[in-house]
Amino acid sequence: EATAFWVGDALQTQAFDGLSRPTGLPAERQLAMLSTLAQASGSLGMAGGQAIDLANVGKAMNQAELEQMHSLKTGALIRAAVALGTLSCPDLTPAQIQTLDHYAAKLGLAFQVIDDVLDCEADTATLGKTAGKDSDNDKPTYVKLMGLHAARTYAETLIAEAVALIEPFGDKALRLRQLAEFVTARKN
């Protein structure tokens, strides 16, 4: 796990380095991109979500609390990735940007729900991390809250809602649809 933390730190600094290089975008957009990534990875995002997760080991959480926690974890980074894409497209309207943000929020939450499901269903070799670790550590999960089948169904519903949101974009949203399919089908 220590190696994973160091790799994550290194990749994060590379992301900031990449965003700080000249791109041809207006400086205001690049600054907005840097701010978006900083918020998504800091205490208002991934780090904050992890802190909530660790603070609630052994405690019951309701669905609203779980959604808040999960929206701050990988969900925040997925939303940031989509936001960075929108910031690089000056032709998008505010309504389109909001739609894409809603897509990303649903996708990010579905990713976390699937992560909880995989922790119960997959084996350690497939997962690439210790299977059952969340359960063993008595962490709050969607599987613990609603059961395995209901958690999987909830994730599939979130994905369907996310894909429906981007339908108006047609072929321009092909990669976003493929990303949603990947999240649903992933095994690790």
What are these regions (language model features)?
Residues 1-165, 174-184:
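Mg2+-dependent prenyl diphosphate-binding active-site environment of isoprenoid biosynthetic enzymes
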